[in-house]
Regions:
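Short, structured segments at the rim of ligand-binding sites
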Residues: 1-433
Length: 433
């Protein structure tokens, strides 16, 4: 079983380049099947989730061609619409974004069938908002035997109000509506940057979407979509993870290929606790040479503090001077890292959707397990700070969303290696001392 072995206590220093946004890529890759012409997508992150989704896209008959490690060409014209368009295999059930193929295939072919989605166990993420949106457009939805089936004689534009702000439902309904007859309005839409990116991608294919990035999205249906070449935006969560890692290890890191406006909530909190953040046109530098201050954080939909950065920021607050309060308002099961972090010496208690963190001077190396993607990244940051050696197992979760995470950290001076056996761990320990 692959795991990371890490010797902590070294500040991160140097430069790191951020990959394309995983959450944007998953929506864009799914939407690429909505035209019969070839689509070329650049800056695709080479992570497990995107690879699995591309396998599923090939599985329904689309042609997928890798131009290079981060560029892929997709042609949906080879899909046979007379099949049941069933997306079901052992891989697709492991990623939550499999449901984007529901909206994409429904929008193009008026029917699709996809396995119930998986992903990280961070709490209930029901698909009722997706279903409500599809039904408002005229589709019939059936759930049976672990599969979701959607079918419509014709999709008709509609007014859709999202009862709860949902990134996934906003993207899915937006895709389903782009070729519906008439106008669709999505109210209380999510505003995350990757929603804007998916909308921009669809517009580059000939869709007519306005208002993405606001809470009201307006879509005028078009007859068909055409091919395009499109580059995915940088990943704000990967960027934020390296920003926090730089601050936690008291380092000095230039984080390249970012959109600083997408990072404002993270930048604001890092500045509040005493780190220095310098913004450039497409990069940010994070510096810290002292113990940071405590603060309070509440996760909120964009442009608020992102839930996907809560575990990483909690690691930094667990090292701060004072008591911090972290309130999780998006997912109810996002404190699974607390037990693991406590093994490293953190003082954290959880009360409902709130964690109270009494800062400690440093962490002690320990053997810990990644419970999910972002918590896994947080535990790696903790291990980079800790005295002595740590191992982080179950890194399959981390590999879902971070490309070459260990390689990028080594480029910043971290002592980290991906290993599979106890013998390899011992060799690493002997080598680094």
């Amino acid at each position: 079983m692959e795991q990371y072995v890490i010797k902590g206590g070294r500040p991160l220093e140097g430069e790191v380049t951020i990959a394309g946004a995983k959450n944007a890529a998953l929506g864009i890759l799914a939407a690429a099947v909505m035209t019969n012409q070839e689509v070329t997508i650049e800056n695709v992150p080479n992570v497990r989730d995107t690879r699995v989704l591309l396998q599923a896209i090939q599985g329904i008959g689309a042609r997928v061609r890798y131009i290079d490690e981060h560029t892929v060409a997709i042609c949906g014209g080879t899909i046979n619409p007379n099949t049941n368009l069933c997306v079901d295999d052992e891989y697709i059930r492991k990623i939550r974004a499999s449901y984007y193929l529901l909206g994409a295939l429904l929008g193009k072919y008026n029917h699709s069938q996809v396995a119930l989605p998986g992903g990280c166990d961070i709490g209930a993420r029901p698909i009722d908002l997706h279903i409500k949106g599809f039904e408002a457009l005229g589709a019939h939805v059936d759930i049976a035997n672990g599969m979701i089936s959607v079918e419509a004689d014709e999709l008709i534009g509609s007014h859709i109000y999202m009862d709860v702000i949902s990134v996934g439902a906003t993207i899915n309904v937006m895709m389903a509506a782009v070729m519906a007859d008439g106008k669709t309005t999505i109210e209380n839409a999510a505003k995350e940057p990757h929603i804007v990116d998916v909308a921009n991608f669809l517009n580059s294919m000939g869709a007519n979407i306005k208002g993405a990035g606001t809470d009201v999205i307006r879509i005028r249906g078009v007859k068909s979509l055409h091919g395009t070449t499109y580059s995915i935006i940088p990943d704000q969560i990967e960027a934020g993870t390296f920003m926090v890692a730089a601050a936690a290890t008291r380092g000095n890191v230039l984080i390249k290929n970012v959109i600083p406006t997408h990072l404002e909530a993270i930048t604001s909190k890092l500045t509040d606790i005493g780190a220095t953040v310098i913004e450039y046109d497409d990069s940010v530098r994070v510096m810290c040479n002292k113990r940071l201050k405590a603060t309070n954080i509440k996760t909120l939909p964009y442009p608020g503090f992102p839930t996907d950065m809560q575990p990483q920021m909690a690691v930094t607050l667990a090292l701060s001077n004072g008591t911090s309060i972290v309130t999780e308002s998006i997912f109810e099961n996002r404190f699974k890292y607390v037990a693991e972090l406590s093994r490293m010496g953190a003082h954290i208690r959880v009360e409902g959707n709130t964690a109270i963190l009494d800062g400690v001077e440093t962490f002690t190396g320990a053997n810990v397990a990644a419970p999910d993607l972002r918590a896994g990244a947080a535990l790696v940051i903790a291990a980079l700070v800790a005295n002595d050696f740590s191992t982080v197992c179950d890194i399959k979760y981390i590999q879902r969303g971070y490309e070459k995470f260990d390689e990028k950290l080594r480029g910043l001076g971290a002592l980290i290696e991906k290993v599979e056996t106890d013998k390899e761990i011992q060799k690493f320990k002997l080598r680094v001392g």
